[in-house]
């Protein structure tokens, strides 16, 4: 039985979340709390497997409570977030502090979305409960070094704000010669923001190809996510726009609620941003991105699947590999949820399985050979 503590100042939200969770026979809400202080007391008392945590609360807010949880009794935490720019920024900060993921707070609307939210909530709680200490499994490991390297140092752009992420980019090693890839496509879901930041912040400003990322996120979150990454990375990061050219040294985040695809028109690489197909399970979809990269560039495409629930990306990687592309998967031990990477590993499609600390180096290696 998975034990959960629900922390929220709204009586409606406490009841709604508890009701949704306990519809799953494998989940028990052992306590609820009205603010961060009460939440810490209940966590100490019940030692839950998972905590759901509101952000805006009296007496002690969610970010303060989260800091205490991660320092004193680290465990998987799901933030309960409003789908606003402010809510997105606070939630992204929470994930930097150690929260695993978030769930939307707009549960009062009577619609079919409630059924999906309920199922997603239950699945997230069950998946992350297996990771007792979020982020702590990201163990340091020596970077992969190809033979006869030439150093390429990642230095922050002048406009980039100083940060621990930017200052830890270090030196990536690359073999000589020209790149053999023209795009890096990344698919990621639960646990993704810290993983994506770890990878992108270690790439050099003169990274030779464009990077396109399909991160499962609502529309209100992808813009702030791109802006936050742009402030801590040497490469430029922005939200993808329909029709824009794919440029070297730049990463493009697919807008929430839309798909992003790579198009190749006589060697001119552009991005297509569209809500179609409407029936896709995820928007953005890693499948749509990976398939488009493979079809557009064949063996000059690189697909990377990072932490996430489910198997989004599997069908797209199949196409990418059929066209001669290269595929990397994040390792089980460094994933928050080993779902999406597991799908391509189990299918025999991953050329390499890589710890998250080594992923930037692995991407650099694959781009050059």
Curated annotation (Swiss-Prot):
Subcellular location: Cytoplasm
Modified residues (4-aspartylphosphate): 54
GO biological process: chemotaxis
UniProt PTM: Phosphorylated by CheA. Phosphorylation of the N-terminal regulatory domain activates the methylesterase activity.
Function: Involved in chemotaxis. Part of a chemotaxis signal transduction system that modulates chemotaxis in response to various stimuli. Catalyzes the demethylation of specific methylglutamate residues introduced into the chemoreceptors (methyl-accepting chemotaxis proteins or MCP) by CheR. Also mediates the irreversible deamidation of specific glutamine residues to glutamic acid.
UniProt name for this protein: Protein-glutamate methylesterase/protein-glutamine glutaminase 1
Active-site feature positions: 189, 216, 312
One GO CC term on file: cytoplasm
Record's compositionally biased regions (Low complexity): 136-168
Gene field: cheB1
SUPFAM superfamilies: CheY-like (SSF52172), Methylesterase CheB, C-terminal domain (SSF52738)
Tagged with keyword Hydrolase: yes
NCBIfam families (UniProt xref): PRK00742.1
GO terms assigned for molecular function: phosphorelay response regulator activity; protein-glutamate methylesterase activity; protein-glutamine glutaminase activity
HAMAP family: CheB_chemtxs
One Pfam family named in its UniProt record: Response_reg
The species this protein was found in: Oleidesulfovibrio alaskensis (strain ATCC BAA-1058 / DSM 17464 / G20)
Keywords of this entry: Chemotaxis, Cytoplasm, Hydrolase, Phosphoprotein
EC number: 3.1.1.61, 3.5.1.44
């Amino acid at each position: 039985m998975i034990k959960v503590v629900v922390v929220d100042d709204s009586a409606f939200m406490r009841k709604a979340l508890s009701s949704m969770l306990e519809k799953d026979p494998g989940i028990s809400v052992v306590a609820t709390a009205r603010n961060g202080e009460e939440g810490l007391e209940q966590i100490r008392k019940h030692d839950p497997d998972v905590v759901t945590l509101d952000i805006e609360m009296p007496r002690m807010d969610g970010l303060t409570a989260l800091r205490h949880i991660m320092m004193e009794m680290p465990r998987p935490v799901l933030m309960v977030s409003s789908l606003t720019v402010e809510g997105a920024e606070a939630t992204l900060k929470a994930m930097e502090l150690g929260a695993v993921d978030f769930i939307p707070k707009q549960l009062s609307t009577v619609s079919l979305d409630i059924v999906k939210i309920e199922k997603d909530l239950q699945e997230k709680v069950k998946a992350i409960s297996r990771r007792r200490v979020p982020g702590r499994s990201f163990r340091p490991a020596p970077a992969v070094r190809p033979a006869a390297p030439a150093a390429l140092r990642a230095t922050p752009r002048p406009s980039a704000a100083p940060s621990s992420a930017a200052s830890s980019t270090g030196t990536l090693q690359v073999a000589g010669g020209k790149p053999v890839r023209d795009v890096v496509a990344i698919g990621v879901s639960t646990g993704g923001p810290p993983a994506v930041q770890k990878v992108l912040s270690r790439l050099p400003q003169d990274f030779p190809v464009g990077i396109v990322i399909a991160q499962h996120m609502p529309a209100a979150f992808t813009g702030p996510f791109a802006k936050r990454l742009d402030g801590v990375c040497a490469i430029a990061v922005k939200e993808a726009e329909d029709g824009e050219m794919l440029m070297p040294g730049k990463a493009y985040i697919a807008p929430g609620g839309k798909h992003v695809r790579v198009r190749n028109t006589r060697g001119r690489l552009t991005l297509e941003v569209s809500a179609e197909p409407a029936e896709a399970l995820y928007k953005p979809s890693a499948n749509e991105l990976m398939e488009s990269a493979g079809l557009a560039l064949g063996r000059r495409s690189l697909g990377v699947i990072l932490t996430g629930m489910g198997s989004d990306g599997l069908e797209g990687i199949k196409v990418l590999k059929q066209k001669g592309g290269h595929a990397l998967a994040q390792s089980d031990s460094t994933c928050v949820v080993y779902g999406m990477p597991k799908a391509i590993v189990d299918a025999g499609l991953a050329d390499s399985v890589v710890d998250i600390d080594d992923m930037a180096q692995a991407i650099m290696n694959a781009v050059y050979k």
